[in-house]
């Protein structure tokens, strides 16, 4: 009987139940646990494990460069960031409203950290999330276009519930390359949100993409439904270096 139960659990793709049912049945017997409670605990263990595996899969597929949470963000070092507004984003209501989130500001002040934190929360809630830099995005689409696979590659960036585009503006894009980015923005417009980080102001986007008309078209779609954060302050890395140098002087 035990072998058959084990076999049936695997055939039904219930590996946790296959592994734990015998021990849990013995525990239920010795602790006077009802049949329904026993079954509930088995099913609960299976669901918890499935959810954990699902989240790990989503993290792997997201291409996030590292894991960050909002709890590790130093709001005291970045007073320009409204913690209340950031934590409101963690409710993920922006997903239902199809609102984009834009983090603007100089390098090293936590834009990517904040974007990844929101992405991690989306993954924890079961939403497909994808991370890529603006430069890598256009390069991948250009290569796919040359290989006759543009539509297939576009779906990689259009399909996820949340798309994080990092480092917009760190490297200039030629107009042809920028057009690929525009296609992604246009296809996600009013369908699914983009979280974007940039070290450039909106007024500089024409220079970034080499085409002011194209830049205006991008911004028109990004900003129509959006939440914007303008971060200011000293770079974390420069701040740590300065504090370290000051500490060494005091010694």
From Swiss-Prot:
Keywords: ATP-binding, Nucleotide-binding, Transposable element. InterPro entries: AAA+_ATPase (IPR003593), ClpA/B (IPR001270), DNAC/IstB-like (IPR028350), IstB (IPR047661), IstB_ATP-bd (IPR002611), P-loop_NTPase (IPR027417). CDD domains: AAA. GO terms for biological process: DNA replication. Coiled coil: none annotated. It comes from the Bacteria. It holds the Pfam family IstB_IS21. SUPFAM superfamilies: P-loop containing nucleoside triphosphate hydrolases (SSF52540). The keyword Acetylation does not apply. GO terms for molecular function: ATP binding; ATP hydrolysis activity. The keyword ATP-binding applies. ATP binds at residues 105-112. Belongs to the IS21/IS1162 putative ATP-binding protein family. This is Insertion sequence IS5376 putative ATP-binding protein. It comes from Geobacillus stearothermophilus.
């Amino acid at each position: 009987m035990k072998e058959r139960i084990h076999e049936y659990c695997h055939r039904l793709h219930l590996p946790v139940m296959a592994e734990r049912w015998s021990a849990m049945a013995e525990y239920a017997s010795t602790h006077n646990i009802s049949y329904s409670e026993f079954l509930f605990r088995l099913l609960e263990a299976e669901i918890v494990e499935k959810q954990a595996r699902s989240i790990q899969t989503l993290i792997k597929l997201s291409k996030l460069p590292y894991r960050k949470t909002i709890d590790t963000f130093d709001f005291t070092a970045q007073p320009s960031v409204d913690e209340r507004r950031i934590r409101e984003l963690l409710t993920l209501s922006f997903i239902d409203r199809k609102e984009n989130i834009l983090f603007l500001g100089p390098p090293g002040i936590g834009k990517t950290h904040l974007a990844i934190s929101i992405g991690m929360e989306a993954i924890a809630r079961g939403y497909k999330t994808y991370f890529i830099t603006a430069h890598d995005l256009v390069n991948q689409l250009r290569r796919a276009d040359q290989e006759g696979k543009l539509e297939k590659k576009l779906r990689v960036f259009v399909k996820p519930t949340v798309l994080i585009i990092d480092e917009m503006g760190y490297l200039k894009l030629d107009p042809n390359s920028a057009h690929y980015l525009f296609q992604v923005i246009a296809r996600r417009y009013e369908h699914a949100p983009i979280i974007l980080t940039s070290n450039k102001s909106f007024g500089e986007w024409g220079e970034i993409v080499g085409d002011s008309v194209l830049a205006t078209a991008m911004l028109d779609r990004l900003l129509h439904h959006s939440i914007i954060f303008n971060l200011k302050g000293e770079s974390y890395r420069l701040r740590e270096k300065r504090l370290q140098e000051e500490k060494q002087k005091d010694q």
